[in-house]
From Swiss-Prot:
GO terms for molecular function: proton-transporting ATPase activity, rotational mechanism. Transmembrane segments: none annotated. The modification N-acetylthreonine is found at T2. The keyword Ion transport applies. The lineage of its organism: Eukaryota, Metazoa, Chordata, Craniata, Vertebrata. Subunit of the V1 complex of vacuolar(H+)-ATPase (V-ATPase), a multisubunit enzyme composed of a peripheral complex (V1) that hydrolyzes ATP and a membrane integral complex (V0) that translocates protons. V-ATPase is responsible for acidifying and maintaining the pH of intracellular compartments and in some cell types, is targeted to the plasma membrane, where it is responsible for acidifying the extracellular environment. Subunit C is necessary for the assembly of the catalytic sector of the enzyme and is likely to have a specific function in its catalytic activity. This is V-type proton ATPase subunit C 1. Keywords: Acetylation, Hydrogen ion transport, Ion transport, Transport. V-ATPase is a heteromultimeric enzyme made up of two complexes: the ATP-hydrolytic V1 complex and the proton translocation V0 complex. The V1 complex consists of three catalytic AB heterodimers that form a heterohexamer, three peripheral stalks each consisting of EG heterodimers, one central rotor including subunits D and F, and the regulatory subunits C and H. The proton translocation complex V0 consists of the proton transport subunit a, a ring of proteolipid subunits c9c'', rotary subunit d, subunits e and f, and two accessory subunits.
Length: 382
């Protein structure tokens, strides 16, 4: 997807002049970025102390909301399984794609009334996104359990004859049932050893019923054969079979159990289909809610940081840049030249990225203008 740089700079004589200067520097001759004004309404400023504290709180809230947005997006990809190419078309904000939403951002006055204090607005966002995060955990847990149980049953019916469930393969007629003396065993015979089996099975132990073995099924490597013998000879037969590389499966024909397993699999499969639609709808709705909340947090951060840096009265222009990937470094240099006068301590930062002890931000994250990255690459396909 796309990376955006959300920046702000103080108004020149007017905010429009600030905008025009940016456009001239980044788009006129060099096509460094695609830009849009980022509209932030007149929010309540409050006291300086509150703004300083809020700056730290908003940084944490930003990380939390971004994490929730990514979790919802990633879980949608997991739920859609084979349709992962369709994930992106389901990741919408307010019914439009994410790039459109960000570049045409309008503050949601109904959800986040600007008559409220900045702290109250941030608390409304935190409460809403925490609810989404908790609901996601509960819904994901329930759906994952269902999916896991179904996969376990499906796994039992897949794989080689040595490990898979045989319930779907055998029939009642393949067994001698309800006999006091006789029992039918199921034996996995490697294809390379099948001729040995035919010659030997009647003499592997005493009391094997002659000509009682048939091939019931096969896979790439083996045949599944039945054989009937007296119950008292079973242990001896198992031992001799193992010596000859024939694997006797532990299997008892039980129609009740087999029917119950089949019904359980059908039930789980039906439940999964029933839950799938509502779950995807919930993910779409709540992805949109979380993403919208995230961009409002970015707007709050730009507002607070701009007031702290540029002072009162509030006079700054927030601008959204979509950098051209090939010229990101050049764009940074142009922005630096444009705004280096705002902060003398920013001199040489562009050339010397390093960490300064005691500062939360590493040098490469600090610029003379207010800057926040919005990364719309929300999915990590495994």
């Amino acid at each position: 997807m796309t990376e955006f740089w959300l920046i702000s700079a103080p108004g020149e004589k007017t905010c429009q002049q600030t905008w025009e200067k940016l456009m001239a520097a980044t788009t006129k001759n060099n096509n460094l970025s695609t830009n849009a004004k980022f509209n932030i309404p007149d929010l309540k400023v409050g006291t300086l102390d509150v703004l300083v504290g809020l700056s730290d709180e908003l940084a944490k809230l930003d990380a939390f909301v971004e994490g929730t947005v990514k979790k919802v997006a990633q879980y949608m990809a997991d739920v859609l399984e084979d349709s992962r190419d369709k994930v992106q078309e389901n990741l919408l904000a307010n019914g439009v794609d994410l790039v459109t939403y960000i570049t045409r951002f309008q503050w949601d006055m109904a959800k986040y009334p600007i008559k409220q204090s900045l702290k109250n607005i941030s608390e409304i966002i935190a409460k809403g996104v925490t609810q989404i995060d908790n609901d996601l955990k509960a819904r994901a847990s329930a759906y994952n359990n269902l999916k896991g149980n179904l996969q376990n049953l499906e796994r039992k019916n897949a794989g080689s004859l040595i490990t898979r469930s045989l319930a779907e393969i055998v029939k009642k007629d393949d067994f001698v049932l309800d006999s006091e003396y006789l029992i039918t065993l199921l034996v996995v015979v490697p294809k390379n050893n099948y001729n040995d089996w035919v010659k030997q099975y009647e003499t592997l132990a005493e009391m094997v019923v002659p000509r009682s073995s048939n091939v019931l099924s096969e896979d790439q490597d083996s045949y599944l054969c039945n054989v009937t013998l007296f119950r008292k000879a079973v242990d001896d037969f198992r031992h001799k079979a193992r010596e000859n590389k024939f694997v006797v499966r532990d299997f008892q024909y039980n129609e009740e159990e087999m029917k119950a397993d089949k019904e359980e699999m059908n039930r789980l499969s039906t439940d999964k289909k029933k839950q799938f639609g509502p779950l995807v709808r919930w993910l779409k709705v709540n992805f949109s809610e979380a993403f919208i909340a995230w961009i409002h947090v970015k707007a709050l951060r730009v507002f607070v940081e701009s007031v702290l840096r540029y002072g009162l009265p509030v006079n700054f222009q927030a601008m959204l840049l979509q950098p051209n990937k090939k010229t990101m470094k050049k764009l940074r240099e142009v922005l630096y030249d444009l705004y280096k006068h705002l902060d003398s301590s920013a001199a040489s930062i562009i050339d010397a990225p390093m960490d300064i002890p005691g500062l939360n931000l590493s040098q490469q994250e600090y610029y003379p203008y207010v800057y926040y990255k919005i990364d719309c690459n929300l999915l990590e396909f495994k």
